[in-house]
């Protein structure tokens, strides 16, 4: 099953699109989605994609976006299922002062495989991108993340940031990260940071001294990473569906 989607945000518009790819837990098959987005001057687009397909699914997800002057594109990606998932995203920040904000959360288990390739092309002046990746690897899961920030000639004053936080729950997981920062302009800044591994020993000791077992600490920290991405989804009904699948209950909300 292959689908194509085109989103055209007119000048000054504000659009939120939610795509929830799901199936029965035991389902198998192949699915592919290509999403192309144009964000006109002063427009805003938020794309939320949630992948919770069955254990036998191979899924291909491709996103291509182009931003014009002072436009903003934001994407929230949650990968929670599927046997093999291939995620690709390319954003051309063409217009001056345009921005990209990407939040990715993934939870991989068994022998699930996730291959991600995210590209931010800084073309216009004073463009900005922020790519934030949070993930949990269990059992014998395999993850590859490629993140490229391309600061091109003419993109004066551009700023690109990329941050990854990966919690390794078991000894047999495979984690691969390939950050790339390309620079063809002087007055620009590109940064990459990563926290990969197990929980800090001092924190683990502190929580264990408060009565938690090591397994409970790891489960709590794993949940916190994914929850932080889920909470960014603006649609409460979508958040509830994801929380019900992961935790068996809806999102807990607290009144001010």
Which residues make up each language-model segment?
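Conserved beta-strand/loop scaffold segments within soluble protein domains that form the structured core
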Residues: 1-212, 228-256
């Amino acid at each position: 099953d292959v689908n194509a989607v085109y989103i055209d945000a007119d000048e000054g518009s504000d659009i939120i699109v939610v795509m929830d790819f799901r199936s029965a837990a035991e389902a198998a098959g192949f699915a592919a989605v290509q999403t192309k987005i144009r964000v006109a001057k002063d427009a805003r687009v938020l794309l939320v994609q949630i992948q919770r397909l069955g254990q036998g699914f191979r899924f291909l997800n491709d996103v291509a976006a182009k931003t014009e002057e002072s436009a903003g594109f934001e994407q929230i990606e949650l990968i929670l299922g599927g046997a093999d998932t291939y995620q690709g995203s390319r954003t051309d920040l063409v217009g001056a002062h345009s921005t990209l904000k990407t939040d990715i959360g993934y939870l991989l288990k068994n022998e699930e495989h996730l291959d991600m390739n995210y590209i931010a092309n800084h073309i216009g002046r004073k463009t900005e991108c922020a790519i934030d990746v949070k993930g949990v690897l269990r059992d014998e899961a395999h993850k590859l993340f490629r993140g490229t920030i391309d600061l091109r000639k003419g993109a004066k004053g551009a700023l690109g940031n990329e941050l990854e936080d990966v919690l390794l729950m078991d000894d047999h997981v495979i984690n691969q990260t390939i950050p790339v920062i390309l620079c063809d302009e002087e007055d620009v800044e590109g940064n990459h940071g990563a926290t990969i591994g197990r929980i800090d020993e001092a924190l683990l000791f502190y929580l264990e001294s408060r009565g938690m077992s090591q397994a409970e600490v790891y489960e709590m920290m794993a949940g916190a990473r994914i929850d932080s991405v889920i909470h960014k989804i603006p649609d409460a009904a979508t958040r509830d569906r994801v929380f019900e699948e992961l935790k068996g209950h809806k999102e807990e909300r607290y009144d001010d």
